[in-house]
Amino acid sequence: MLSSGFLLTLFFVTLVIAVLSGLIFLMPSVPVKYIRLHLTLLLLPVIVGVIGLITINGREVIGIFALDKLAWLVGAFVLALGFIIQKFSARYLLGDRNYRKYFPLYTFTTVFASIGWLSNDLRLIVICWGLTLFCLTQLIRLNRSWKVPAEAAKVSARSFIIGWVALLLAVVVFFIGTGDWVIDPSQDYDVSMSYGLKLIVDLLLVIAVIIPAAQYPFQSWLIESVVAPTPVSAIMHAGIVNAGGIILTRFSPVFDNNIALTLLLIISSISVLIGSGISLVHVDYKRQLVGSTMSQMGLSLIHI
């Protein structure tokens, strides 16, 4: 049986290899055919993640990382989806003037997301989440010669900054209330935290999760992002628009205030209706998918 420590080390080694491979592809002297090797290297962390998912029993904390089935599942899912999108992009984007830039940005986006969801330290989660959103913004604005993607990137960046700052403040307030950067699933935070601080954390978490999920009234960033190439829209589903459920799962020992839960329920319900309306009204299939995504994310947050 492979130990969790060995698998975690192997996982990070394969992530580093994937990142370096993406950077190598930026070099003009590297032939375009190198993309085949890059795609092969992208499979390595996915394989390690699947092995970790199969072999893990219970929950193991190794340094600043907490390994359980959810962590390995999300990590492997994000990287697998990233691999599929890059494989599709290898031919779909061929001929694009920014062809070489897409693949390292895809890789960075999924690598940072997967590391964040494996982390047990809230500070690392905030850092990785911020880097993931930054890379996604760069993907949206990659075609700088066209003003429309640049404006879409600005709208997305403003929304992402608000959501990221909300998550950062939630973590800081949590630290003020508990003196710890780690959420302990066995801890009763109704006792260890004051009601006021816990309410603030929960309300900040609501803001932090509804923005990446494109919930009302922050759906404009996803609507504007349809100007980006199809694979860029697809990469948003690699632990980004669906990150709200993951964040709330990680914060579940803290996120149980009735006011925050009711607010999230109302916002998600409104978003489901708006998303359904967008899907019915628009004839553009990408905007129909935006409406579908809003509705699906709203339903997932309602169930949480």
List the predicted regions and their residue ranges.
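Hydrophobic transmembrane alpha-helices and their helix-loop junctions in integral membrane proteins
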Residues: I84-R100, Y106-I125, C135-I302
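Transmembrane helix-loop-helix hairpins at membrane boundaries of multipass inner-membrane proteins
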Residues: M1-P104, G179-V191, Y195-L197, S220
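Adenylate-forming
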Residues: D68, H303-I304
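Alpha-helical transmembrane segments and their immediate interhelical/interface regions
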Residues: M1-V13, W117-L136
